[in-house]
C-alpha cells in the first residue's frame, strides 16, 4: 500500500519559537589635555582693481608665511585651506554700484606647542592677518585614547546587560550575538569669528578634550 501527498498540500514544517533578544548601549569617555591646536587664519583684501586686491593680498600673505616660519612652525604644518575671489557691490534702489573685488586667502596652521597659540595669533595679526575663523584643540594620541574609551564602552554595556538579566532573571548568553560601534561627535571646538587687532596675545584656554566611544550590544536569551 502506498500513500501519495497532494501537490496542493504544504510541506510539513517544525514551528520554532521566536528568538528573544536584548539590546543594551554602552558609553566610554577619556578626558585628556590637548597637545595640538589647528588654527584657520587668513588675509582678506578689497580693491576696485582686482589686480591691486590680489597684489596686496599676496604681499601680506608672504609676510604672514615668513612670520609663521620664524616662529618655528614647519612648512608641512602650514597649508592653504581656501583662496576665494568675490566681486562686491553696494546697492541703492535695487541697483548695483561701487563694484570692487574681495580676495581671501585662508591658511590651516597646525601648532604642536599650544601654549604659544595666543602669541602666534597676536604676531600674525600684526603682520596682516584679519580673519581667524576657527581654533580647534585636539591630540596626536587620538587612536590610543579612542581604544581606551571603546574598552570602557564595552564594559559599560556588558555591566548593564548583567544588571538587566539578574533583575529580570533572564538566561542571557555570555557573549553578544551582535556588536555595533556607534558614531560619536569629534572633540570640542573653540571658535572665534575674526582676528583681534589689539597689541597683546589673546588668552586662549584649551582646557580638556574628551574622546568618546559608544557601542550597541545585542544578547539572545
Predicted features and spans:
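Short, charge-dense linear interaction motifs
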Residues: 1-127, 131-133, 138-144, 148-221
Amino acid at each position: 500500500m502506498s500513500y501519495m501527498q497532494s501537490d496542493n498540500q504544504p510541506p510539513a514544517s517544525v514551528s520554532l519559537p521566536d528568538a528573544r533578544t536584548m539590546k543594551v548601549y554602552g558609553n566610554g569617555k577619556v578626558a585628556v589635555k590637548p597637545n595640538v591646536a589647528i588654527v584657520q587664519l587668513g588675509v582678506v583684501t578689497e580693491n576696485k582693481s582686482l589686480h591691486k586686491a590680489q597684489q596686496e593680498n599676496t604681499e601680506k600673505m608672504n609676510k604672514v608665511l615668513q612670520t609663521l616660519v620664524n616662529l618655528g612652525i614647519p612648512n608641512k604644518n602650514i597649508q592653504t585651506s581656501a583662496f576665494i575671489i568675490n566681486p562686491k557691490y553696494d546697492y541703492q534702489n535695487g541697483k548695483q554700484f561701487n563694484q570692487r573685488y574681495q580676495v581671501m586667502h585662508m591658511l590651516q596652521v597646525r601648532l604642536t606647542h599650544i601654549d604659544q597659540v595666543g602669541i602666534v595669533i597676536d604676531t600674525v595679526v600684526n603682520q596682516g592677518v584679519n580673519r581667524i575663523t576657527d581654533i580647534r584643540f585636539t591630540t596626536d594620541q587620538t587612536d590610543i585614547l579612542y581604544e581606551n574609551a571603546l574598552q570602557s564602552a564595552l564594559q559599560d554595556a556588558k555591566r548593564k546587560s548583567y544588571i538587566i538579566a539578574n533583575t529580570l532573571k533572564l538566561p542571557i548568553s555570555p557573549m553578544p550575538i551582535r556588536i555595533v560601534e556607534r558614531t560619536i561627535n569629534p572633540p570640542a571646538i573653540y571658535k572665534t569669528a575674526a582676528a583681534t587687532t589689539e597689541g597683546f596675545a589673546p588668552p586662549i584656554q584649551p582646557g580638556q578634550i574628551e574622546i568618546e566611544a559608544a557601542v550597541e550590544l545585542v544578547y539572545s536569551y
